[in-house]
Amino acid sequence: MSELLTKKISAFIITKNEAARIERAINSVKNIADEVIVVDSESTDKTVIIAESLGAKVVVKPWLGYVGQKSFAETICKNDWILNIDADEELSKELQDEIEYIFASQNQDRYLAYQIKLLIMHRNDTRPRIFAPYNKCTRLYNKKFASFANTINSTTHDSVVFNKDVDFANKIYTLNEAAYHYSGTSIEQLVAKANFYSGEQAKDLIKQGKKPSNIRIATEMIWWFFKAFFIRRYFVFGFDGFVDSMIFAFARFLRLAKLRELSLQCNPATRSQDLKTQFVIQDPVDKPRDDNIV
């Protein structure tokens, strides 16, 4: 950690089989953090070995969901100020310098939390593209006032939420410099993540009593491809952006398809009514239904 920082920062990263990316993530935070904690979900690759070799404190924790893992990580951070990045992210050198300047000048407590711009980096790129899409997320915050644990009814939508008794008006500052979010290591990895994440989302939605219409399921991919490729500007990545947008749209479709499946399993009595609205062409003569077609 830089000796210029007057208040110390705890950085944490949650991982599962991130041997290919964890070094980049840790190296981008270790110069501004007093401690780097890796909460690992029983990786079977060299994630733990690499993290420990870089000086990180590794705690193995069976998977609790995205919110659960990050909430647990907060509890073992010794400092009030917490910096969270994911294993597929990296703080730019400029952002590291900006954070160091704020803390070295003792101005960090003017705000309760800081938002970071996460520039999307395609896995084949070495630097950000012009007009690359980005997301703004609260990733640097004082845990006395905010926490991932305040997220309600979700194990997947991991966001820092302020305590109910905290007035956070004008207390969040968006940092000028950016971090980089890498889109994935391969198409195979993106598809595997889409399959896993959509299942977790479906479980969250069924707990909330959600049930999608068949029309919504049928049109979900069309809308989300349009949103990813055009509105979120994945077109800047060329044909690679087209491929990733298709995978993203498919993930959104899977989320609703799995939700429908769970809904039918939870309430079998609705199945006969649901079948009446499905887009299945029936033969005029009754025949045994092929469930693989449904």
UniProtKB/Swiss-Prot annotation:
Keyword tags: Glycosyltransferase, Transferase
InterPro entries, per database record: Glyco_trans_2-like, Nucleotide-diphossugar_trans
EC number: 2.4.-.-
Any one Gene Ontology molecular-function term assigned to this protein's record: glycosyltransferase activity
Domain of life: Bacteria
Coiled-coil region: none
Pfam families, A to Z: Glycos_transf_2
Family (UniProt): Belongs to the glycosyltransferase 2 family. WaaE/KdtX subfamily.
Protein name: Uncharacterized glycosyltransferase RBE_0523
Species name: Rickettsia bellii (strain RML369-C)
Taxonomic lineage of the native organism: Bacteria, Pseudomonadati, Pseudomonadota, Alphaproteobacteria, Rickettsiales
